[in-house]
């Protein structure tokens, strides 16, 4: 196991929050995955539910999202890649401060929704990464 310098943040990423990718026809993709792989979801895609270690008493299960986006989406910008990974994190505000100090490119401002806070960074190969601090319960 590689132990990277963590600047007093014990855990940076706690799990995979989601896989997002561009599709020519997102609706058709969701229908195909529902029909052939049993991934029945909603308008956004499918959510895998699971229990987070150490948080077995959480009111709601944790989730990992699978979601096709329209191929013309600008959500993944400034990345030119047809996909984006979402990672679950703890203490997003502090983590983004540390990442900025480390020279990591921060994209946009933190956004907050009923299901958590979101921030974005770029990796060295131009992949946009979404960081998600879920609200209690993991959803």
What are these regions (language model features)?
Residues 2-30, 82-85, 135-139:
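N-terminal beta-strand motif that seeds the catalytic metal site of vicinal oxygen chelate
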Residues 50-53, 121-124, 134:
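Active-site beta-strand termini and strand-to-loop segments that position acidic
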Residues 10-14, 20-64:
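Core segments of cupin and vicinal oxygen chelate
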Residues 23-28, 78-128:
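Vicinal oxygen chelate
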Residues 44, 114, 135-138:
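A short acidic/small-residue loop/turn micro-motif
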Residues 67, 130:
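Conserved beta-strand in the GNAT
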Residues 70-71, 108, 133-135:
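Acetyl-CoA-dependent GNAT
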């Amino acid at each position: 196991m590689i132990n990277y310098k963590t600047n007093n943040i014990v855990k940076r990423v706690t799990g995979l929050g989601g896989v997002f990718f561009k599709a020519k026809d997102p609706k058709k993709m969701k229908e195909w995955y529902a029909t052939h792989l049993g991934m029945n979801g909603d308008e956004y895609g499918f959510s895998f539910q699971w229990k987070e270690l150490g948080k077995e008493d959480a009111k709601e299960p944790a989730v990992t999202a699978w979601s096709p986006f329209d191929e013309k989406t600008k959500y993944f910008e400034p990345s030119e890649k047809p996909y984006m990974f979402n990672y679950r994190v703890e203490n997003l505000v502090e983590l983004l401060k540390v990442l900025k100090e480390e020279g990591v490119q921060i994209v946009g401002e933190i956004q907050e929704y009923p299901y958590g806070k979101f921030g974005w960074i770029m990796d060295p190969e131009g992949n946009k990464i979404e960081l998600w601090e879920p609200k209690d319960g993991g959803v």
